Amino acid sequence: MKIERKCKIVSKKQMGDAICMVLEAGDMVRASFRAPGQFVHIKCGDGQLLRRPISVCSCQEVVPHDLLTIVFQVRGEGTAWLAGRCEGDTLDVMGLLGNGFKMEREGRYLLVGGGIGVPPMRGCAQYTGGKSTAILGFRSGDKAILTGYFQDECAKVLIATDDGSLGHHGFVDALVRQELERDSGYDAVLACGPRPMLRNVAKVAGEFGVPCQVSMEERMGCGIGACLVCACDMKDGARKHVCKDGPVFDAREVDWDA
C-alpha cells in the first residue's frame, strides 16, 4: 500500500561518496513494508523536478515515528537538491514501494552488493538476524561504506575492491564462487549493483544450482514507469519496468543479453 508522509530528517552524514539520512516516517513502515529491497519516492524541489526513487537501506518500526535510513549518491539535479537538505528539514516521501526480495527471517542468504548497491542489502542482513553472509564490492577502500554495520549484522563479511586496496583484489563474483565452493547450502543469492555485476553473480549462482534474485534498482529513473529508462527485457519476451514490476527479479527470468 502506497503511503505519503512528511518525513523529518533526524540525522545526516557523509559516507565516502554517498550521503546517509535517517528519516522519521510516521507509520510508513508499519503500513507498507513487505520485504527488504523496497524503495521510497522523494519529491526533490518545488519546481518541475520529478520525484526520485531512492532505495531503502534499513527501516525500523517505532511508535510514534517509524525510522527509514536512505543512502544515496548525487547523480543529477534531483539528488543534488536532496543532498542539500539538512537535519530538521522535512521531505515529501511516498513508500514503501516496489517488490522486494522473497526471503524468510529463518533463512540463510548470500548477500552481494556492489557500490551504491550495498545499502539495500543491509535490510536483508537485519531481516535474517545475523545468519547471512555478505559480499561487498567497491572501487577502492576509501569508497567502502557500511562495512561495520554488516560485520555486526552478518555471520561473515567478505570485501572486494577493484584496485585491491581493501580485501580481495578483483570483483565480487570471484568471492561468490569461492564462497559457494565452500558452502552451497544458502537458501538463495540476493544481489544489488551494476548490471554487469548482477549478470556475473547470477551466472555463478546458476552454476552451483543456488537460486538468485537481483535488484535492478540502479536503472530506475522517474520511479513511476513514465520515463521508460528502467525497461527490463525478460527471457519470455516480456518487457517489465524495474520501478513498477521490480526492482527485484528472479535472475533466471532476466534476458541478460538484451
Language model features with spans:
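Structural signal for conserved beta-strand scaffold positions within catalytic alpha/beta enzyme cores
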Residues: 11, 58, 159-161, 214, ...
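Short, surface-exposed secondary-structure boundary micro-motifs
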Residues: 45-46, 96, 235
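FNR/FR-type flavoprotein reductase catalytic core
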Residues: 77-216
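Local cysteine-cluster metal-coordination motifs and their immediate loop/turn environment
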Residues: 120, 195, 217-248
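Short microdomains enriched in Cys/His and/or Lys/Arg
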Residues: 244-258
